[in-house]
């Protein structure tokens, strides 16, 4: 059987783009156990409460829920265990410097398969206040309305 190519999405954290201003994104590998891989192959995971933390020069992913594999036995994994992320040393050092500035955090954006390996996209992000969220929603709605008006104009329908 040939290896799968491309990028196949497993889970996405849509809430993160609403709650945070995304400054930079990174792709990282994950250290997983066998039953976790099988659960991910079934397309089951949740990134909603997830975050990444740096300790001892390593990046750890916390609170990402990968449910137990239904066919697993006593060797099954804990659903919310912390998982090590694989990044280049230079990327880790850059992230250490930026997260220590204050106000910045690492949040997972998406979990996907890339060439048969589980990858996670993490973002260096700054939390938004509630008024910033409302402002972003208003801007998005205005842009959508402008796009609709331009589309009607292009089709020859005014109003």
From Swiss-Prot:
Pfam families: SmpB
Domain of life the protein comes from: Bacteria
GO biological process: trans-translation
Keywords carried by this UniProt record: Cytoplasm, RNA-binding
Disulfide cross-links: none
InterPro entries for this protein: SmpB, SsrA-bd_prot, SsrA-bd_prot_CS
NCBIfam families: PRK05422.1 (NF003843), smpB (TIGR00086)
Protein name: SsrA-binding protein
Species per Swiss-Prot/TrEMBL record: Frankia casuarinae (strain DSM 45818 / CECT 9043 / HFP020203 / CcI3)
Gene it is expressed from: smpB
